[in-house]
Amino acid sequence: MKRILVAAACLLPFALAAEASINRHSPAAVVEAAYAADQTAIQAGGDGIMGDNVLRARVFSRSLLRSIAANELIPTASPAIIRDPLSDQAPHMAAIDVALVSESRDEAKVLAEFARGDGARERLTYDMVFERGEWRIDDIVYATLDGRSHTLRGVLAAN
């Protein structure tokens, strides 16, 4: 029994590395992984991706990271969307659907749609760039079904 556990523990890093190498080639998989990581951290009482600089660097482009960092230096309180950009402050997320909209060599668009806890559905479009050998989120376009829309970069620039 002990040998089986040791063998499984030794093989786990290889299995995770194989999964990571598959996912890095799919922009939609990056968005799905970002939601999974964010929700896991939030359910455990953490701040999600925005509270972990390593996760931020794996998910966001360098340009977007610089904009977020510059915004965090401003002494006034950041808008709530910046603290939780993946859900646009949805009270609860359910039935998340992620689909690739378009993909070129170095840019892609991914659509994520989910049910909010308040009964509305929300659509987020992720502008992705291929950077440092992986797909990364470069901007997020938030559009609710009532017709309002805004972007993460727009919110950052407004502060």
What are these regions (language model features)?
Residues 4-14:
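Sec-dependent N-terminal signal peptides
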Residues 15-20:
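Sec/Tat signal peptide C-region and signal peptidase I cleavage site
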Residues 21-22, 59-120:
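Surface-exposed, charged secondary-structure patches
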Residues 21-76:
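Core segments of small alpha/beta cavity-forming domains
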Residues 28-35, 111, 125, 153:
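Extracytoplasmic/secreted envelope proteins and their assembly/folding machinery
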Residues 73-74, 103-107, 118-122, 131-132, ...:
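Low-complexity, intrinsically disordered terminal/linker segments enriched in charged
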Residues 98, 124-130:
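Hydrophobic/aromatic beta-strand elements that line small-molecule binding cavities or substrate pockets
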